């Protein structure tokens, strides 16, 4: 598979990221013992710049949805960091997530689902979504377990989940997320959804404590700068990313950050680090910042 990266005996295949043209951090991680599908969700926003999605965005959405469904066929375990629809697939018909009930059944069937606690450290909106998901998993006979601060062993592979960290800065109304560390005898890969930098210092410390070979992480949402994301939090995120780049192997920095046309200017110091790349760059593909350029794609610039 052309998009597959290797770190020791761990294979990593990024499936959906903003640099591929969609909202997602879906990733397939394979070790000699277990294959894990991380955050199997994808979405495009109904409105950006007051405009509906361009044709290219719909095409990218379908492409990534197909990638996720194919990856699920290979997976033994599915992990869910939180309950936003770009990070899990609901048992609902949703146009902007390219899913319906059958999509979800095919995705979760016969897999072990390790998920964020649906009742603790969660906001009301995500609690409703979590309840809807777990109820349907139970109806379908799908095994699931709460993963917060727990470890699961599969042969010589260990899946280690973080405590719930804020979805961005401390005190955010967006709730909490889990990070996932996949560890084998000779490599470590870490997936950090929606920590937005990270802004929160304890999240940084958990991410770097074992000096992972690869970190896949969501950058700060600079497209919301001055609206829902402050300059102070951007400075924290930048400082933490610079520190991270010195303490880990490779960094794939993507997701929220790439909804901003000027994302490289916002974090120019970070991208000067030789080990920080987008998901598209990591796999040798051209970046497709479709949401960020929706105005141009729609001829409304």
Q: What residue ranges belong to the model's regions?
A:
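Charged helix-capping and loop-helix junction motifs
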Residues: 97, 175, 208, 230-240
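A short acidic, amphipathic alpha-helical/loop segment
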Residues: 93, 202-207, 240, 266
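A short helix->loop->beta-strand "cap" motif at the edges of active sites that frequently abuts
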Residues: 34-35, 107-113, 246-251, 273-274
